[in-house]
């Protein structure tokens, strides 16, 4: 696979039409002196931000809707994202040892988790996500944060051909979007250095047995959900991909304290995806979303 060809296609998409307009508007903000705090809310603070510049920043942030992962605060502009992503990150944080490591975040969205990882002193962080929209969101936030995080508009399928390998890979909320989950796990494994580890999460079916739900059309109104496994099935997938040391870190029911509609997204959110008369079921009648967080090694 020619990943440079894939890069060029995404670069061309980034540099055309509205995407190019937004990219240039971000660059036109200029070099603004600020301080950044990478806590539950990514907080960007300014000493003397003019009202005119603040209005530019607000307009740009609005043009980048919908905002899924976060939240972010830029001066007094609070980007109240659909997901309270700190809930997931704080579940994982006690298990992280990233000091001096080369880290990848596969399906990194706008970079929220990568910004949080900076507090753990990794050697290098590289994000992978083919979405030009979220790449622009990252560019917007990183314009102020000025980090050395690298953002590749590539997918998990490009990992076996990437120029370098990683000590730790995060792959959060991706595997159920792949029609061949075992192949995806093998792609993750191919990108690891010896002794490497993967932090993985997925929606799961809270039952015993080695099977997976394969929704006919949608799951929680999401069309590209292929398999929602039991934990036993997930462990089997990982073992087939030649991972070892399958460790369950946490499980959690997804609720409206974590995922909800805000003015910073368009369309619907979790409250619209569940049965209005029984929130233990999705609108389609499947078990409502629960997530399991695991660590696997090679």
From Swiss-Prot:
| Assigned EC number | 2.5.1.-
Catalytic activity from the UniProt record: carboxy-S-adenosyl-L-methionine + 5-hydroxyuridine(34) in tRNA = 5-carboxymethoxyuridine(34) in tRNA + S-adenosyl-L-homocysteine + H(+)
One Gene Ontology BP term is:
tRNA wobble uridine modification
Gene3D superfamilies, per the entry: Vaccinia Virus protein VP39 (3.40.50.150)
Per UniProt, the enzyme's principal EC class comes to transferase
Enumerate the UniProt keywords alphabetically. Answer: Transferase, tRNA processing
Which branch of life, at top level? Bacteria
Q: Where does carboxy-S-adenosyl-L-methionine bind?
A: 69, 83, 88, 107, 129-131, 156-157, 176, 291
Please tell me whether the keyword Acetylation is annotated for this protein: no
Is the keyword tRNA processing assigned to this protein? Answer: yes
The record's listing under SUPFAM superfamilies reads:
S-adenosyl-L-methionine-dependent methyltransferases
Question: By its UniProt entry, which CDD domains does this protein fall under?
Answer: AdoMet_MTases
Q: Please name the NCBIfam families in this protein's record.
A: PRK15068.1, tRNA 5-methoxyuridine(34)/uridine 5-oxyacetic acid(34) synthase CmoB
By sequence similarity, the record places it as follows:
Belongs to the class I-like SAM-binding methyltransferase superfamily. CmoB family.
Q: Which HAMAP family match?
A: tRNA_carboxymethyltr_CmoB (MF_01590)
Oligomeric state and partners?
Answer: Homotetramer.
Reported function:
Catalyzes carboxymethyl transfer from carboxy-S-adenosyl-L-methionine (Cx-SAM) to 5-hydroxyuridine (ho5U) to form 5-carboxymethoxyuridine (cmo5U) at position 34 in tRNAs.
Q: This protein is called what? A: tRNA U34 carboxymethyltransferase
């Amino acid at each position: 696979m020619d990943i440079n060809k894939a890069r060029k296609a995404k670069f061309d998409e980034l540099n055309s039409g509205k995407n190019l307009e937004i990219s240039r508007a971000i660059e036109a903000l200029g070099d603004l002196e600020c301080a950044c705090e990478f806590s539950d809310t990514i907080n960007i603070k300014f000493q003397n931000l003019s009202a005119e510049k603040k209005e530019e920043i607000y307009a740009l942030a609005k043009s980048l809707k919908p905002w899924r992962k976060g939240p972010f605060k830029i001066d007094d502009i609070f980007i109240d994202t659909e997901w309270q992503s700190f809930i997931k990150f704080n579940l994982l944080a006690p298990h992280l040892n990233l000091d001096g490591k080369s880290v990848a975040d596969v399906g990194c969205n706008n970079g929220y988790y990568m910004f949080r990882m900076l507090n753990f002193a990794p050697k290098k962080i590289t994000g992978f996500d083919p979405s030009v929209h979220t790449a622009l969101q990252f560019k917007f936030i990183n314009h102020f944060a000025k980090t050395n995080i690298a953002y590749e508009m590539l997918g998990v399928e490009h990992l076996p051909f990437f120029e370098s390998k990683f000590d730790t890979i995060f792959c959060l909320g991706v595997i159920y979007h792949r029609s061949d989950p075992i192949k995806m796990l093998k792609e993750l494994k191919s990108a690891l250095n010896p002794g490497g580890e993967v932090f993985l999460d997925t929606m799961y079916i809270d039952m015993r047995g080695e099977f997976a739900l394969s929704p006919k059309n949608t799951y929680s109104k999401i069309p590209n959900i292929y398999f929602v496994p039991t934990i036993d099935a997930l462990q089997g997938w990982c073992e087939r991909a030649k991972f070892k040391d399958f460790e369950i870190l946490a499980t959690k029911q997804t609720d409206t304290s974590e995922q909800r509609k805000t003015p910073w997204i368009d369309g619907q959110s979790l409250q619209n995806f569940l049965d209005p008369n029984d929130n233990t079921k999705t609108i389609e009648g499947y078990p409502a979303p629960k997530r399991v967080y695991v660590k696997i090694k090679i």
